[in-house]
């Protein structure tokens, strides 16, 4: 007989197995319930839980759970949408041409809140640890302009590179903006 349990389960996940104990040849199910209100995060998330068999850790037994947390704007009235924040970027792509290995490429992305309510930056996520980006401010008033510097560390990479930054806000028409830094890294 086999009983599964999980370690490192975050507070926003509820994991259950059915049946609780598997008999030889029997099938079971793992149920995962995700509560985004408890996650305090936005955008793509991944959690890797270790599976224990009969209370013991087993090498390479990982259970991955992914989710994409987005704001629900479906209840907004037409008036609320008309008065909502609106993010407008000067540029969403920066082509740095060529850069040498083990250097830094930086670019300042500029944007404006063209809406009538405060624009809130929920999260900025890069697709590679080699790229960093931090906003100057997380609340942009109506009509206000702001910017942030994105830095790509070329490291030992070579060839064509394309790094993405996901800019997540409370703009109901464009809650996630994908920004790109691209170019060729040479020796």
What residues fall within each predicted segment?
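Long, low-complexity ectodomains and other extracytoplasmic segments of secretory-pathway proteins
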Residues: 54-110, 114-115, 172-187
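Short acidic/proline- and small/hydrophobic-mixed sequence motifs that coincide with surface turns
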Residues: 1-4, 58-60, 116-121, 160, ...
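Short, solvent-exposed loop/turn segments enriched in Ser/Thr/Gly
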Residues: 37-50, 101-108, 158-164
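Surface-exposed binding patches on compact interaction domains or structured appendages
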Residues: 1-27, 117-144
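Extracellular/luminal low-complexity segments enriched in Ser/Thr/Pro
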Residues: 31-41, 150-157
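Short, acidic/polar linear motifs in exposed loop/turn regions
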Residues: 1, 38, 55, 114-117, ...
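C-terminal soluble interaction/assembly domains
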Residues: 108-114, 122-126, 131-168, 176, ...
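Short strand-edge motifs at loop-to-beta-strand transitions and within beta-strands
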Residues: 26-32, 94, 144-150
């Amino acid at each position: 007989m086999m009983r599964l349990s999980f370690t490192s389960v975050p507070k926003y996940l509820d994991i259950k197995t059915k049946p609780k104990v598997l008999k030889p040849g029997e099938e079971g199910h793992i149920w995962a319930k995700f509560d985004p209100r408890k996650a305090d995060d936005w955008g793509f998330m991944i959690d890797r839980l270790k599976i224990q068999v009969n209370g013991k850790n087993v090498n390479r037994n990982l259970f991955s759970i992914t989710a994409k947390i987005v704001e629900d704007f479906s209840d907004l009235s037409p008036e609320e949408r008309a008065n909502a924040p609106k993010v407008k970027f000067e540029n969403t792509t920066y082509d740095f041409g060529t850069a040498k290995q083990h250097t830094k490429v930086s670019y300042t992305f500029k944007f404006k809140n063209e809406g009538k309510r405060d624009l809130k930056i929920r999260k900025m996520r890069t697709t590679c640890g080699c790229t960093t980006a931090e906003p100057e401010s997380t609340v942009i008033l109506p009509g206000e302009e702001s910017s942030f510097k994105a830095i790509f560390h070329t490291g030992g990479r070579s060839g064509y590179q394309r790094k993405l930054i996901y800019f997540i806000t409370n703009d109901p028409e464009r809650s996630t903006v994908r920004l790109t830094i691209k170019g060729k890294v040479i020796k």
